[in-house]
Protein backbone atom coordinates (compact mmCIF):
# COMPACT_ATOMS: atom_id res chain seq x y z
CA UNK A 1 0.00 0.00 0.00
CA UNK A 2 1.41 3.40 -1.00
CA UNK A 3 2.18 6.06 1.58
CA UNK A 4 -0.70 8.27 0.49
CA UNK A 5 -3.22 5.40 0.36
CA UNK A 6 -2.55 4.23 3.92
CA UNK A 7 -5.01 5.31 6.57
CA UNK A 8 -4.05 7.30 9.64
CA UNK A 9 -5.01 4.37 11.86
CA UNK A 10 -2.88 1.84 9.99
CA UNK A 11 0.12 4.13 10.24
CA UNK A 12 -0.14 4.75 13.99
CA UNK A 13 -0.79 1.06 14.69
CA UNK A 14 2.39 0.25 12.81
CA UNK A 15 4.14 2.76 15.05
CA UNK A 16 2.97 0.89 18.15
CA UNK A 17 0.19 3.27 19.22
CA UNK A 18 -2.58 1.49 21.17
CA UNK A 19 -6.26 1.70 20.25
CA UNK A 20 -6.98 3.34 23.59
CA UNK A 21 -4.48 6.09 22.78
CA UNK A 22 -6.03 6.43 19.31
CA UNK A 23 -9.50 7.07 20.77
CA UNK A 24 -8.04 9.51 23.29
CA UNK A 25 -6.45 11.36 20.36
CA UNK A 26 -9.82 11.47 18.55
CA UNK A 27 -11.55 12.88 21.64
CA UNK A 28 -8.91 15.58 22.10
CA UNK A 29 -9.08 16.46 18.41
CA UNK A 30 -12.89 16.77 18.51
CA UNK A 31 -12.64 19.05 21.53
CA UNK A 32 -9.92 21.24 19.99
CA UNK A 33 -12.09 21.70 16.89
CA UNK A 34 -15.04 22.73 19.04
CA UNK A 35 -17.08 19.76 17.82
CA UNK A 36 -17.72 18.16 21.20
CA UNK A 37 -17.10 14.59 22.37
CA UNK A 38 -19.89 13.10 20.21
CA UNK A 39 -17.84 13.89 17.11
CA UNK A 40 -14.97 11.72 18.36
CA UNK A 41 -16.54 8.55 16.95
CA UNK A 42 -16.91 10.17 13.51
CA UNK A 43 -13.29 11.25 13.60
CA UNK A 44 -12.21 7.76 14.65
CA UNK A 45 -14.19 6.15 11.82
CA UNK A 46 -12.77 8.57 9.25
CA UNK A 47 -9.18 8.07 10.38
CA UNK A 48 -9.65 4.29 10.37
CA UNK A 49 -11.12 4.04 6.89
CA UNK A 50 -10.10 7.03 4.75
CA UNK A 51 -6.71 7.16 3.04
CA UNK A 52 -4.31 9.88 4.06
CA UNK A 53 -4.72 13.08 2.08
CA UNK A 54 -1.72 13.99 -0.10
CA UNK A 55 -0.51 17.55 0.51
CA UNK A 56 1.82 19.75 -1.52
CA UNK A 57 3.17 22.72 0.46
CA UNK A 58 4.64 25.57 -1.59
CA UNK A 59 6.45 28.76 -0.55
CA UNK A 60 6.32 32.16 -2.24
CA UNK A 61 7.26 35.55 -0.80
CA UNK A 62 7.22 34.85 2.95
CA UNK A 63 9.32 34.59 6.10
CA UNK A 64 8.41 30.95 6.91
CA UNK A 65 6.71 31.97 10.17
CA UNK A 66 3.67 29.86 9.20
CA UNK A 67 5.83 26.74 9.01
CA UNK A 68 7.48 27.71 12.29
CA UNK A 69 4.04 27.95 13.89
CA UNK A 70 2.75 24.73 12.31
CA UNK A 71 5.57 22.56 13.65
CA UNK A 72 4.73 23.69 17.19
CA UNK A 73 1.16 22.39 17.19
CA UNK A 74 0.15 20.55 20.35
CA UNK A 75 -3.42 19.39 19.48
CA UNK A 76 -2.80 17.41 17.37
CA UNK A 77 0.98 17.14 17.53
CA UNK A 78 2.53 18.07 14.21
CA UNK A 79 4.26 14.69 14.01
CA UNK A 80 0.84 13.03 14.06
CA UNK A 81 -0.48 15.39 11.40
CA UNK A 82 2.52 15.17 9.06
CA UNK A 83 3.62 11.56 9.57
CA UNK A 84 0.24 9.90 10.06
CA UNK A 85 -2.80 12.05 9.26
CA UNK A 86 -1.72 13.49 5.91
CA UNK A 87 0.85 12.51 3.34
CA UNK A 88 3.08 15.59 3.09
CA UNK A 89 4.71 14.65 -0.19
CA UNK A 90 6.34 18.00 -0.96
CA UNK A 91 7.52 20.87 1.22
CA UNK A 92 10.78 22.41 0.04
CA UNK A 93 11.49 23.83 3.51
CA UNK A 94 11.50 20.62 5.55
CA UNK A 95 11.86 17.80 2.99
CA UNK A 96 15.14 15.93 2.66
CA UNK A 97 15.26 16.17 -1.13
CA UNK A 98 16.52 19.31 -2.87
CA UNK A 99 17.13 20.68 -6.34
CA UNK A 100 16.16 18.49 -9.29
CA UNK A 101 15.23 15.62 -6.97
CA UNK A 102 12.67 17.81 -5.17
CA UNK A 103 11.23 19.02 -8.48
CA UNK A 104 10.87 15.41 -9.64
CA UNK A 105 8.93 14.57 -6.46
CA UNK A 106 6.63 17.53 -7.07
CA UNK A 107 5.83 16.41 -10.62
CA UNK A 108 5.35 12.80 -9.50
CA UNK A 109 2.92 13.81 -6.74
CA UNK A 110 0.94 15.99 -9.11
CA UNK A 111 0.60 13.21 -11.70
CA UNK A 112 -0.12 10.44 -9.19
CA UNK A 113 -2.76 12.30 -7.17
CA UNK A 114 -4.36 14.48 -9.81
CA UNK A 115 -7.51 16.11 -8.43
CA UNK A 116 -6.95 14.57 -4.98
CA UNK A 117 -4.23 16.60 -3.31
CA UNK A 118 -4.47 19.73 -1.17
CA UNK A 119 -2.25 22.58 -2.26
CA UNK A 120 -1.03 24.49 0.80
CA UNK A 121 0.52 27.84 -0.06
CA UNK A 122 2.67 29.88 2.31
CA UNK A 123 3.52 33.32 0.98
CA UNK A 124 2.34 34.96 -2.21
CA UNK A 125 3.44 35.47 -5.83
CA UNK A 126 4.80 38.81 -7.07
CA UNK A 127 3.35 39.63 -10.49
CA UNK A 128 5.49 42.58 -11.53
CA UNK A 129 8.04 42.00 -14.32
CA UNK A 130 6.60 38.60 -15.14
CA UNK A 131 6.96 37.31 -11.60
CA UNK A 132 10.76 37.54 -11.66
CA UNK A 133 10.94 38.79 -8.06
CA UNK A 134 10.39 35.22 -6.80
CA UNK A 135 12.02 32.33 -8.64
CA UNK A 136 11.38 28.73 -7.59
CA UNK A 137 13.05 25.84 -9.39
CA UNK A 138 14.20 28.13 -12.18
CA UNK A 139 10.67 29.42 -12.84
CA UNK A 140 8.66 32.38 -11.58
CA UNK A 141 6.74 31.20 -8.54
CA UNK A 142 3.46 32.43 -10.02
CA UNK A 143 3.84 29.99 -12.95
CA UNK A 144 4.52 27.10 -10.61
CA UNK A 145 1.56 28.09 -8.44
CA UNK A 146 -0.85 28.15 -11.37
CA UNK A 147 0.42 24.81 -12.65
CA UNK A 148 0.00 23.04 -9.30
CA UNK A 149 -3.37 24.69 -8.64
CA UNK A 150 -4.86 23.21 -11.83
CA UNK A 151 -5.03 19.69 -10.40
CA UNK A 152 -5.56 20.52 -6.71
CA UNK A 153 -8.69 19.46 -4.85
CA UNK A 154 -8.55 22.63 -2.75
CA UNK A 155 -6.09 25.32 -1.77
CA UNK A 156 -5.16 26.47 1.72
CA UNK A 157 -3.73 29.99 1.92
CA UNK A 158 -1.54 29.94 5.03
CA UNK A 159 -1.04 33.22 6.84
CA UNK A 160 -1.55 36.89 6.09
CA UNK A 161 0.89 36.75 3.15
CA UNK A 162 -1.12 34.21 1.17
CA UNK A 163 -4.49 35.48 2.39
CA UNK A 164 -4.10 39.26 2.08
CA UNK A 165 -0.61 40.13 0.81
CA UNK A 166 0.91 41.23 4.14
CA UNK A 167 4.08 43.33 4.37
CA UNK A 168 5.27 42.30 0.89
CA UNK A 169 2.19 44.07 -0.46
CA UNK A 170 2.69 47.17 1.69
CA UNK A 171 2.31 50.42 -0.24
CA UNK A 172 3.66 51.14 -2.82
CA UNK A 173 4.08 47.36 -3.35
CA UNK A 174 6.88 47.54 -5.97
CA UNK A 175 6.87 43.78 -6.68
CA UNK A 176 3.05 43.66 -6.98
CA UNK A 177 2.83 40.93 -4.33
CA UNK A 178 -0.67 39.47 -4.71
CA UNK A 179 -2.92 37.29 -2.50
CA UNK A 180 -3.56 33.76 -3.73
CA UNK A 181 -7.28 34.26 -4.38
CA UNK A 182 -6.49 37.11 -6.78
CA UNK A 183 -4.34 34.77 -8.88
CA UNK A 184 -6.25 31.48 -8.60
CA UNK A 185 -9.94 32.14 -9.14
CA UNK A 186 -11.31 28.75 -10.20
CA UNK A 187 -10.56 26.68 -7.07
CA UNK A 188 -11.96 26.68 -3.52
CA UNK A 189 -9.53 28.55 -1.28
CA UNK A 190 -9.45 28.43 2.51
CA UNK A 191 -7.83 31.49 4.02
CA UNK A 192 -6.09 30.91 7.35
CA UNK A 193 -4.76 34.41 8.10
CA UNK A 194 -2.43 35.55 10.83
CA UNK A 195 1.23 36.47 11.00
CA UNK A 196 1.56 33.63 11.69
CA UNK A 197 -1.68 31.69 12.22
CA UNK A 198 -2.06 29.79 15.48
CA UNK A 199 -0.54 26.31 15.21
CA UNK A 200 -3.69 24.51 16.38
CA UNK A 201 -5.79 26.50 13.92
CA UNK A 202 -3.58 25.27 11.08
CA UNK A 203 -3.64 21.62 12.13
CA UNK A 204 -7.34 21.96 12.99
CA UNK A 205 -8.18 22.92 9.41
CA UNK A 206 -6.15 19.99 8.08
CA UNK A 207 -7.81 17.64 10.58
CA UNK A 208 -11.30 18.78 9.59
CA UNK A 209 -10.67 18.19 5.88
CA UNK A 210 -9.07 14.82 6.57
CA UNK A 211 -11.91 13.72 8.85
CA UNK A 212 -14.99 14.91 7.01
CA UNK A 213 -13.71 14.95 3.43
CA UNK A 214 -14.95 18.50 2.85
CA UNK A 215 -13.95 22.07 3.51
CA UNK A 216 -14.98 23.69 6.79
CA UNK A 217 -17.72 26.31 6.70
CA UNK A 218 -16.22 29.62 5.60
CA UNK A 219 -17.20 33.22 6.28
CA UNK A 220 -17.68 35.78 3.51
CA UNK A 221 -13.92 36.42 3.42
CA UNK A 222 -13.08 32.75 3.00
CA UNK A 223 -11.94 32.05 6.56
CA UNK A 224 -13.05 28.96 8.54
CA UNK A 225 -15.83 30.05 10.89
CA UNK A 226 -14.78 27.60 13.58
CA UNK A 227 -11.72 29.77 14.27
CA UNK A 228 -12.54 33.21 12.86
CA UNK A 229 -16.15 33.87 13.87
CA UNK A 230 -15.41 35.91 17.01
CA UNK A 231 -13.36 38.98 17.76
CA UNK A 232 -10.42 38.59 20.11
CA UNK A 233 -12.08 41.30 22.20
CA UNK A 234 -15.20 39.15 22.72
CA UNK A 235 -13.36 36.48 24.74
CA UNK A 236 -10.46 38.53 26.08
CA UNK A 237 -9.85 38.03 29.80
CA UNK A 238 -9.24 41.81 30.06
CA UNK A 239 -12.72 42.58 28.71
CA UNK A 240 -14.19 43.30 32.19
CA UNK A 241 -11.62 46.08 32.61
CA UNK A 242 -12.69 47.54 29.26
CA UNK A 243 -16.34 47.52 30.33
CA UNK A 244 -15.39 49.11 33.65
CA UNK A 245 -13.36 51.85 31.97
CA UNK A 246 -10.07 50.65 33.43
CA UNK A 247 -7.33 51.28 30.85
CA UNK A 248 -3.55 51.20 30.66
CA UNK A 249 -2.46 54.79 29.98
CA UNK A 250 1.26 54.17 29.42
CA UNK A 251 3.59 51.21 29.50
CA UNK A 252 4.49 49.99 32.98
CA UNK A 253 2.06 52.22 34.81
CA UNK A 254 0.07 50.88 37.75
CA UNK A 255 -2.82 49.92 35.44
CA UNK A 256 -0.46 47.87 33.27
CA UNK A 257 0.82 46.03 36.32
CA UNK A 258 -2.78 45.29 37.33
CA UNK A 259 -3.58 43.87 33.90
CA UNK A 260 -6.08 46.53 32.80
CA UNK A 261 -7.39 46.86 29.22
CA UNK A 262 -4.85 47.77 26.51
CA UNK A 263 -7.33 49.55 24.22
CA UNK A 264 -5.73 52.96 24.76
CA UNK A 265 -2.34 51.50 23.89
CA UNK A 266 -3.55 50.61 20.41
CA UNK A 267 -4.93 47.10 20.94
CA UNK A 268 -6.81 45.99 17.81
CA UNK A 269 -8.72 43.21 19.57
CA UNK A 270 -12.12 44.93 19.07
CA UNK A 271 -11.78 44.68 15.27
CA UNK A 272 -9.76 41.47 14.86
CA UNK A 273 -11.35 38.09 14.21
CA UNK A 274 -9.20 35.22 15.43
CA UNK A 275 -9.01 32.52 18.11
CA UNK A 276 -6.08 33.99 20.07
CA UNK A 277 -8.06 34.64 23.25
CA UNK A 278 -9.57 31.12 23.29
CA UNK A 279 -7.06 28.73 21.68
CA UNK A 280 -4.02 30.87 22.59
CA UNK A 281 -0.41 30.08 21.63
CA UNK A 282 2.32 27.63 22.59
CA UNK A 283 -0.08 24.87 23.53
CA UNK A 284 -2.58 27.23 25.15
CA UNK A 285 -0.04 28.92 27.42
CA UNK A 286 -0.54 32.56 26.45
CA UNK A 287 -1.25 35.12 23.71
CA UNK A 288 0.06 38.64 23.03
CA UNK A 289 -2.49 40.48 25.19
CA UNK A 290 -1.83 38.13 28.10
CA UNK A 291 1.90 38.86 27.81
CA UNK A 292 1.20 42.59 28.11
CA UNK A 293 1.12 43.83 24.51
CA UNK A 294 -1.96 44.83 22.56
CA UNK A 295 -3.21 42.88 19.54
CA UNK A 296 -1.82 44.29 16.26
CA UNK A 297 -4.64 42.78 14.18
CA UNK A 298 -2.33 40.55 12.13
CA UNK A 299 -5.16 38.36 10.83
CA UNK A 300 -7.04 41.29 9.27
CA UNK A 301 -6.66 42.51 5.70
CA UNK A 302 -4.42 45.55 5.34
CA UNK A 303 -3.24 45.67 8.96
CA UNK A 304 0.28 46.57 7.79
CA UNK A 305 -0.87 49.80 6.10
CA UNK A 306 -3.29 51.10 8.75
CA UNK A 307 -0.94 53.24 10.78
CA UNK A 308 0.98 52.61 13.97
CA UNK A 309 0.27 49.52 16.04
CA UNK A 310 0.04 51.89 19.00
CA UNK A 311 -2.59 54.26 17.60
CA UNK A 312 -5.88 53.93 19.46
CA UNK A 313 -8.89 52.73 17.48
CA UNK A 314 -11.37 55.57 17.11
CA UNK A 315 -14.15 54.13 14.96
CA UNK A 316 -15.46 51.43 17.29
CA UNK A 317 -19.15 51.58 18.23
CA UNK A 318 -19.88 49.47 21.28
CA UNK A 319 -20.28 49.74 25.03
CA UNK A 320 -17.23 51.19 26.65
CA UNK A 321 -15.80 52.98 23.60
CA UNK A 322 -18.43 55.11 21.90
CA UNK A 323 -18.66 57.40 24.94
CA UNK A 324 -14.97 58.35 24.73
CA UNK A 325 -12.54 56.14 26.62
CA UNK A 326 -11.06 59.12 28.47
CA UNK A 327 -14.39 59.71 30.20
CA UNK A 328 -15.37 56.12 30.90
CA UNK A 329 -13.25 55.77 34.02
CA UNK A 330 -14.74 58.95 35.47
CA UNK A 331 -18.26 57.87 34.59
CA UNK A 332 -17.70 54.41 36.05
CA UNK A 333 -16.26 55.92 39.22
CA UNK A 334 -19.19 58.32 39.42
CA UNK A 335 -21.65 55.48 38.99
CA UNK A 336 -19.97 53.48 41.74
CA UNK A 337 -19.95 56.54 43.99
CA UNK A 338 -23.64 57.18 43.34
CA UNK A 339 -24.45 53.55 44.08
CA UNK A 340 -22.52 53.68 47.35
CA UNK A 341 -24.26 56.93 48.34
CA UNK A 342 -27.67 55.48 47.48
CA UNK A 343 -26.92 52.36 49.49
CA UNK A 344 -25.84 54.47 52.47
CA UNK A 345 -29.00 56.59 52.24
CA UNK A 346 -31.26 53.54 52.10
CA UNK A 347 -29.43 52.00 55.06
CA UNK A 348 -29.82 55.21 57.08
CA UNK A 349 -33.56 55.37 56.33
CA UNK A 350 -34.00 51.73 57.37
CA UNK A 351 -32.14 52.33 60.62
CA UNK A 352 -34.26 55.41 61.38
CA UNK A 353 -37.45 53.48 60.70
CA UNK A 354 -36.28 50.66 62.98
CA UNK A 355 -35.52 53.11 65.80
CA UNK A 356 -38.98 54.67 65.48
CA UNK A 357 -40.64 51.25 65.60
CA UNK A 358 -38.65 50.37 68.72
CA UNK A 359 -39.59 53.70 70.37
CA UNK A 360 -43.29 53.19 69.58
CA UNK A 361 -43.14 49.65 70.91
CA UNK A 362 -41.45 50.70 74.18
CA UNK A 363 -43.92 53.51 74.77
UniProtKB/Swiss-Prot annotation:
Gene Ontology BP, a term: anaerobic respiration
UniProt-annotated binding residues for [4Fe-4S] cluster 2:
233, 236, 261, 267
Sequence positions that bind [4Fe-4S] cluster 1? 63, 66, 161, 195
- Name any cofactors this protein relies on: [4Fe-4S] cluster; [3Fe-4S] cluster
Its subunit composition reads: Heterodimer of a large and a small subunit.
Q: Which NCBIfam families match?
A: hydA, TAT_signal_seq
The protein's name:
Uptake hydrogenase small subunit
Species of origin: Bradyrhizobium diazoefficiens (strain JCM 10833 / BCRC 13528 / IAM 13628 / NBRC 14792 / USDA 110)
